[in-house]
Amino acid sequence: MKRTLFVIIAIVTAGACLAASPEQSKQFISPVYTIDKIYHSMEGPSSVERVYLGDPAAPAEVLWVTGIRTEMVDADGATPQLPELMCHVNVDLDPARHQALFGFRRATAARLMTLSQGMLTAKVPAGFGFPLASNEPLLLFTQVLNLNIQKPQNLKVRHRVTIDYIRARDLTSPIKPLFNVGASGMVQLDDNPLAMAHSMASMPVPAMASVTTDAGHDSTSMSSAASCLIGARAPQATSTSADYVDPQGRKMTGHWIVPPGKQVNHSDISWFMNLQFDTKLHYAAVHLHPFARSLEMRDMTSGKTVFLAKAENPPNAIGLLHVDEFTSAEGVPLLHAHKYSLISTYDNPTTTNADSMASVFLGLDDPELVVPNSDQLAHASATLFDANTLVLHTNIGTITAAFDREHAADTVIQVSRFVLAGAFDATRLIGQKNASIAVTPPMVRTSSLLQPTRLESGVERKPGTVSYCRPGGARMEATILIDMDQPKDPDSTCIGFARIVKGLDLLAAIQPGTSASIVNAETVLRPDAAPKVVAAK
């Protein structure tokens, strides 16, 4: 069932990030949830909605996300409800879109910010923020729980979520960019009686509601919104109950049992964080379950505590009254050569087993980001996500191809990223012996632009199909192939992403051993350039 998320915009005149920079807030009201019984963590009614901080139809501009908060309200959207009914709120990026828009070399984590029971507000230090394009889709996941009310009698409740941000155009001095990194405490799954086979695969159906982004990505690429875990489940563990597979090949889970009494769990998160450079920690949010006492992030190399978050439990009920967050304008150094661990402490006072998790969501200094201005961001957004045509300007004439974003969304973004960076400029169309024409941009131009792409069906390989071939195996460099005949043995590393609509006769003149020069390439939006494209079988 499609749900509607109501949006309210509020302007806060006194900026929290910079005194002279007014902070804006956008409010989202979740669907009405009915609480009719006891719901433990991740079991209650939930929804996933796509939201925007700006107008998705307008040219993109740079925003800085500075905070998030949620309030539990009645069905009317205004009357306060019990905070203890809050399970969690996740705000997730579309990682491929975000990475391409801002030109990141590193992989981008999906989870931007999160809230959970005991932590209903999160705010980065003044002068810091997470960069976001105004037309980027966010996935807003909200969920409720009920740990204490035995007869709730169909209690109606909603989340009222507020996201705070600053428009870059309103800044009077630069803001310091943060990037998001997450990590989870884990236990080994195999032969471990305390491990819980409780992952996304076993979540209630409502929490996995199908969502499709404007970039064409479906819920499989952004399904982390419906989980407190970090990132996607390990692909090696798709058919198992594992959430992750560590570098030693061990199946790990981020959910485990806390038996009666005290339990301390140590987890190496170095491989999880995968820091590529030295940085500083300025912000951390923590996700814990009832009976948690604390969560510590420790530098195992130096033996020093990075931060310690304490949790407060209610005296006569189950839940979390308060969980510390961490903020620091000065920052705590995190070194890529050091090892880091999460140490969770639980104390279960009951006579039965309890479930547990321990996750952190970090905001780190971003030394790599070159902040685009609004014109640059709008151009990048149009090139990467709006254009439907690839245009090659050559010495023999103009060649155009129609993109197929339906069957090759990630591949089109990858190729468009090359175009945006000028990787195809002053290259050559070279005739091949296998009745195809190849374009191979220099590796020095493409190596920093490569991003992981999921396996896509792509366009059927036949004369006129344009394919992207990933580097690997015998092919050392990223290559564009144009089929001039039916390929006899199609390369499985090549994904068709477009069809030639103009210039096929020009290409036919390029025989094996001959070539033509590409002056430059561009992507454009043409209303008449969308022929019917057949997906690969």
Which positions does each model-derived feature cover?
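Generic low-complexity, intrinsically disordered sequence content enriched
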Residues: 9, 182, 508-511
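Beta-strand-centric surfaces of beta-sandwich/beta-rich domains
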Residues: 20-378
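Generic detector of short alpha-helix boundary/capping microenvironments
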Residues: 7-8, 56, 272, 385, ...
